[in-house]
């Protein structure tokens, strides 16, 4: 399997990396979050820009990013506009979604960009090309907040992401039962054994918490923890998360 190196973080080896989301609505709130995150043992910061009140003004988005980057100069930043259809805060058209992501990827000020799988393929491929030209890694994602698809479907989506050029394919699904969590873990194990790229998977909500902890066993390269406000159901406090990941890593 290929390792994916972003600044001082290597995905695809050792314990799963910890990503903590920033969800501030204003520049002041984002600066406060970034300063707090300086004090936390994390690997990646995800800026959930769909929470940002001035997201439709690209100059203001870049200015806010500059403020975050000043406070967190060495921390990998994952730039994510989560669409409303996949659980995000704001509904926007496809044209704006791609303009926003391509513009910010072109600045060279982000390290990773989230690209949702279920979009027009030509748009997805163009955004991946723009990202890679600017040395930005692509986290290609899919989120199902209603259910856990069949194992074959989860495997198919992750495999498709890699085929399209994702550096880190990602899927998050909602369990209705413990069996659904096992389905996600089984699919993760199957894909990670044959994939060329590290993958990121999780089963959400309380039932799925085990999937956020067991990535090193089943083959998920990153997990999401909460420092202030969780951006998805089931996210664990980042300090508790690090403790458990370290404990499992020592036994592995």
Swiss-Prot record:
GO biological process, one term: aromatic amino acid family biosynthetic process
Binding positions (3-dehydroquinate): 46-48, 82, 212, 231, 235
Active-site residues from the entry: 143, 170
Annotated pathway: Metabolic intermediate biosynthesis; chorismate biosynthesis; chorismate from D-erythrose 4-phosphate and phosphoenolpyruvate: step 3/7
Database matches in InterPro entries: 3-dehydroquinate_DH_AS, Aldolase_TIM, DHquinase_I, Type-I_3-dehydroquinase
Origin: domain of life: Bacteria
Subunit annotation: Homodimer.
HAMAP family to which the protein is assigned, alphabetical: AroD
Stated family: Belongs to the type-I 3-dehydroquinase family.
Protein's name according to its UniProt entry: 3-dehydroquinate dehydratase
């Amino acid at each position: 399997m290929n390792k994916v190196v972003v600044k001082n973080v290597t995905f695809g080896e050792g314990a799963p990396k910890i990503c903590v989301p920033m969800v501030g609505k204003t520049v002041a709130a984002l600066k406060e979050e970034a300063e707090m995150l300086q004090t936390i043992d994390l690997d990646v910061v995800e800026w959930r820009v769909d929470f940002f009140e001035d997201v439709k003004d690209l100059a203001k988005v870049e200015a806010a990013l500059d403020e975050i980057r000043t406070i967190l100069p060495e921390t990998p930043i994952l730039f994510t506009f989560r669409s409303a259809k996949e659980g995000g805060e704001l509904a926007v058209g496809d044209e704006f979604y791609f303009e926003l992501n391509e513009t910010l990827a072109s600045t060279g000020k982000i390290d990773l960009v989230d690209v949702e799988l279920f979009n027009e393929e030509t748009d997805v491929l163009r955004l991946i090309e723009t990202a890679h030209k600017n040395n930005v890694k692509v986290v290609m994602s899919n989120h199902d907040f209603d259910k856990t698809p069949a194992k074959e479907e989860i495997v198919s989506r992750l495999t498709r992401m890699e085929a399209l050029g994702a550096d880190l394919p990602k899927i998050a699904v909602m369990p209705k039962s413990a069996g659904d969590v096992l389905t996600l873990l089984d699919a993760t194990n199957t894909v990670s054994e044959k994939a060329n790229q590290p993958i990121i998977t999780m089963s959400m909500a309380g039932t799925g918490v085990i999937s956020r902890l067991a990535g090193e066993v089943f083959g998920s390269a990153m997990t999401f923890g909460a420092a202030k406000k969780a951006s998805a159901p089931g996210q664990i406090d980042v300090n508790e998360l690090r403790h458990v990941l370290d404990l499992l890593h020592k036994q592995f």
